[in-house]
A protein has these predicted regions:
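Adenylate-forming
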Residues: 116-120, 146, 189-193
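Short loop segments at secondary-structure junctions
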Residues: 97, 123-125, 167-169, 196-200
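A short core secondary-structure module
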Residues: 170, 174-201
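N-terminal glycine-rich flavin-associated loop
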Residues: 107-127, 156
Length: 201
């Protein structure tokens, strides 16, 4: 079995060892050899003034990652045959993906989508899962996470000022967000907004 990427844990489950072996092989075959191409594609997008446009390389490698069974590895609960590993098991996979900053998207394991998908999988209604989770898991859309606000230190969620008030069958959201991860991506179709439904809480 492959050696763990760090001494953080003494042993990994057989499933994680298998995923680690296949992930390292994928990096050797497809990620490391394409770092120069990724840099060139990103540079071209920068020169064109739109770094958020999808990259041909990433789209090509997504197909290969899915075929290799290295897709949606982050899900802590199995959902329709995907994911089903613990955070402990996912940690060494993150270490490998962290070696190349852009690789997470290749495996549909990049923020903010991962956290948003976990939220939908755990708390979403069946209708929300069908409308948003399924396309996210399939990699057809991207999502954004709106937490940071200009007037408060909102990395501490208790400081958030954005209010969410029930109005009949609707909710009224009132607030200002910025630095909204993922919002610039043209494939972004879902925004998860952090706000307070209880202004005193």
């Amino acid at each position: 079995p492959p050696k763990p990427p760090s001494p953080m844990f003494a042993t990994y489950s057989p499933k994680t060892q298998d995923l680690l072996q296949r992930l390292n092989a994928f990096f050797d075959q497809h990620i490391y050899p394409n770092e120069a191409r990724h840099h060139a594609e990103l540079d071209a997008l920068r020169r064109a003034g739109d770094v958020w446009q999808p990259m041909a390389l990433i789209d090509e490698l997504k197909v290969k990652a899915r075929a290799a069974g290295l897709w949606n590895m982050f899900l802590p609960h199995a959902y329709k045959g995907q994911g089903g590993i613990s955070n402990l098991d996912y940690a060494p996979l993150c270490e490998v993906m962290g070696r190349v900053s852009w690789s997470g998207e290749v495996f549909n394991c990049s923020a903010p989508d991962t956290g948003n998908m976990e939220t939908l999988e755990r708390y979403g209604t069946d209708a929300q899962k069908e409308q948003w989770l399924e396309p996210l898991l399939d990699g057809r859309i991207r999502s954004a996470f709106l937490m940071t606000e200009p007037a408060v230190a909102s990395s501490d969620a208790t400081n958030i000022q954005c209010s969410i008030v029930r109005d009949g069958d609707d909710y009224v959201i009132n607030g200002t967000k910025w630095w909204s991860s993922g919002a610039g991506d043209p494939r972004c179709a879902l925004y998860i907004v952090m706000g307070k439904t209880d202004p005193d809480g």
